[in-house]
Amino acid sequence: GILKKFMLHRGTKVYKMRTLSKRSH
């Protein structure tokens, strides 16, 4: 449903942020 899509989108966003953070450090 729409909630699943939203959660998946949020998860991807967090994952990208974490990856950038790791690359930064």
From Swiss-Prot:
One of its GO terms (biological process) is defense response to bacterium. Signal peptide: none annotated. Keywords: Antibiotic, Antimicrobial, Cytolysis, Fungicide, Hemolysis, Secreted. Its main location: secreted. Expressed by the venom gland. It is found in: Secreted. GO terms for cellular component: extracellular region. Minimum inhibitory concentrations (MIC) are the following: E.coli standard and drug-resistant strains (MIC=5.0 ug/ml), S.aureus standard strain (MIC=0.5 ug/ml), S.aureus drug-resistant strain (MIC=1.0 ug/ml), B.dysenteriae standard strain (MIC=2.5 ug/ml), B.dysenteriae drug-resistant strain (MIC=5.0 ug/ml) and C.albicans (MIC=7.5 ug/ml). Antimicrobial peptide against both Gram-positive, -negative and yeast. Also induces histamine release by mast cells and shows moderate hemolytic activities against both human and rabbit red cells. This is Antimicrobial peptide scolopin-2. It comes from Scolopendra mutilans (Chinese red-headed centipede). The lineage of its organism: Eukaryota, Metazoa, Ecdysozoa, Arthropoda, Myriapoda.
